[in-house]
């Protein structure tokens, strides 16, 4: 295998996105010491729209389009993403080439006054950026007030610190990667807040005509994480998964046995449809599809129809 002379990684400009890209850069430099690995920092539309939730302005694709443009015009060779922000169906000519080992997939409870969601008094304001978290919080704690929370990690924490929220819920991996794990008051187990498909994992996107990159990037891929994420994203794909759908999917591997949990909820949390499926890891795609079909059969289809065509108020 010939060693690349130079590789350029496209990344978003946020501190967390830069950490993720630098992590991949450092892994590549260790693998290929003679290769010059550089970062191309870009601002995406998702980074610019901070006054509305993603579910109202176009969803996950807002975080990848500018990076894909850089892949297309040759300014970058690969793009690094937080996998939960990547649409399940990438448009041609793009593909996910490698999925790295997953970090902590759980959601984190962050507050300056309280230790858990259960400690919050009635009417306390909880901030979160996703309908998935919002619906699960509303189901378990209907006495709380859940409000949208946008911005990068530092912005979200500053909004908490100035008193806009009593608590916020966000992905644990982001805090831990940036050395801010001490801000976490408690971790929400999957039983309490089922994670998003791909949460905690990083994905590398390339153009599908870059066969050379597939070979060079293969050592970064984690087969166990990939199996779990394939099952999770199969659920999301079958249900038209986007930021507009309160959808969660989380798989775990025990040996070669893959166990998948998934749910679809109404945004107000009054209806939560759950599914569990298991099987050999090599059947990850089929396991995800089976879980999605069970969700649809048990009432998720009605929730999805309402989200696509909300009733007139």
Curated annotation (Swiss-Prot):
Taking the record's annotation, the residue ranges forming a coiled coil are none
The EC designation for this entry is 2.5.1.61
Q: In which pathway does it act?
A: Porphyrin-containing compound metabolism; protoporphyrin-IX biosynthesis; coproporphyrinogen-III from 5-aminolevulinate: step 2/4
Kindly give the Gene3D superfamilies that the UniProt entry links to this protein.
Answer: Periplasmic binding protein-like II (3.40.190.10), Porphobilinogen deaminase, C-terminal domain (3.30.160.40)
A GO CC term attached to the entry? cytoplasm
Top-level EC class as recorded in UniProt: transferase
Q: What is a biological process (GO) this protein takes part in?
A: protoporphyrinogen IX biosynthetic process
Pfam families named in the record: Porphobil_deam, Porphobil_deamC
Highest taxon of source: Bacteria
Q: Which GO molecular-function terms appear in the entry? A: hydroxymethylbilane synthase activity
Which cofactors does this protein require?
A: dipyrromethane
Q: Which keywords does UniProt give here?
A: Porphyrin biosynthesis, Transferase
Q: Which NCBIfam families match?
A: hemC
Q: Please give the function described in this protein's UniProt entry.
A: Tetrapolymerization of the monopyrrole PBG into the hydroxymethylbilane pre-uroporphyrinogen in several discrete steps.
How does it associate, per the subunit comment? Monomer.
What the record says about family reads: Belongs to the HMBS family.
HAMAP family per record? Porphobil_deam
Q: What is this protein called?
A: Porphobilinogen deaminase
Q: Which organism is it from?
A: Bordetella petrii (strain ATCC BAA-461 / DSM 12804 / CCUG 43448)
What taxonomic ancestry is recorded?
Bacteria, Pseudomonadati, Pseudomonadota, Betaproteobacteria, Burkholderiales
């Amino acid at each position: 295998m010939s060693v690349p002379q130079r590789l350029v990684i496209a990344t978003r400009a946020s501190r967390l996105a830069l950490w993720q890209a630098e992590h991949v850069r450092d892994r590549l430099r260790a693998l290929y010491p003679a290769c010059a690995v550089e970062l191309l920092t870009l601002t995406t539309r998702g980074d610019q729209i901070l006054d509305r939730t993603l579910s109202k302005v176009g969803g996950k694709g807002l975080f990848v389009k500018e990076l894909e443009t850089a892949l297309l015009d040759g300014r970058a060779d690969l793009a690094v993403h937080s996998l939960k922000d990547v649409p399940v169906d990438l448009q041609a000519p793009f593909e996910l080439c490698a999925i790295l080992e997953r970090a902590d997939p759980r959601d984190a409870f962050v507050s300056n006054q309280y230790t858990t969601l259960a400690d919050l008094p009635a009417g306390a304001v909880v901030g979160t950026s996703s309908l998935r978290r919002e619906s699960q919080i509303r189901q378990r704690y209907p006495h709380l007030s859940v409000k949208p929370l946008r911005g990068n990690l530092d912005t979200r924490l500053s909004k908490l610190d100035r008193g806009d929220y009593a608590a916020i819920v966000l992905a644990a991996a982001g805090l831990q990667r940036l050395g801010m794990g001490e801000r976490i008051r408690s971790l929400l187990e999957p039983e309490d807040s089922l994670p998003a498909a791909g949460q905690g994992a990083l994905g590398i996107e390339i153009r599908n005509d870059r066969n050379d990159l597939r070979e060079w990037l293969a050592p970064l891929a984690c087969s166990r994480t990939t199996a779990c994420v394939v099952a999770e994203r199969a659920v999301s794909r079958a249900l038209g998964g986007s930021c507009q759908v309160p959808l969660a999917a989380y798989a775990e591997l025990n040996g070669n046995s893959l166990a998948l949990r998934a749910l679809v909820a109404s945004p107000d949390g009054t209806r939560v449809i759950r599914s569990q499926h298991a099987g050999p890891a090599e059947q990850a795609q089929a396991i995800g599809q089976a879980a999605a079909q069970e969700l649809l059969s048990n009432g998720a289809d009605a929730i999805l129809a309402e989200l696509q065509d909300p009733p007139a108020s």
